[in-house]
Amino acid sequence: MVASIAGEEEPAAEKSQQSPDHFQPYRPYYYPPYRGYPITYPYPYPHGYPKPYHNFQTIAKPNEGPTDQPEANSANSIEEGGVSKRLFIEPIFNLFRPRPRDPIVVNQAPPPPPVIYQAPPPPPPPPIFQQAPPTIYQQPSPTIIQQAPQPSVTKLVYSQPEPSHSVIYQTQPKTELVYLNQ
């Protein structure tokens, strides 16, 4: 019994958890403003309330047909005994209409110039090694040295003891003394 009751209650609990908007993204509902509440636009009215930027020039007055005078058919015209709706409604919507504001200029340095990517230059072509022509070494011509004729040298042989100097060179006549004690 308990198992059957628990088994019957489980599908009911699952149905209660699964709401129709369970799989829809959460969107909060904005209630329409009551009297005296500040109106903030844009206001997401789900029931199709007129937008605050509606052009009141195009709204035709009820129970009036088209006339030859275009000003009489517009909301900006002043009726007999009354004032135009535009004079009251337009300023209210202008309070909440976003106005263009001057941009806040801060003393900043000028932005750096954009970096333009420049591809590196291509590498230089490999050097072409040209074989130099073989150097021909020319042997110099042999120089012939001609020896001048030497003057005749007379050798004088003495049998005397060696003096203080062994060789005596004389210029004219050129003589060479050779001793036996050498």
UniProtKB/Swiss-Prot annotation:
Signal peptide extent: 1-7
Segments passing through the bilayer: none
Primary localisation category: secreted
Keywords: Repeat, Secreted, Signal
One Gene Ontology term, aspect cellular component: extracellular region
Compositional bias per record (Pro residues), positions renumbered to this chain: 109-128
Annotated stretches, region: Disordered: 1-26, 56-79, 104-136
Subcellular location: Secreted
Protein origin, superkingdom: Eukaryota
Tissue: Spermatophore.
Function as written in the Swiss-Prot or TrEMBL entry: Structural protein of a layer within the wall of the spermatophore produced probably by cell type 4 of the bean-shaped gland (BAG). Fixation in the spermatophore seems to require covalent cross-linking of spermatophorins.
Protein name: Spermatophorin SP23
Species per Swiss-Prot/TrEMBL record: Tenebrio molitor (Yellow mealworm beetle)
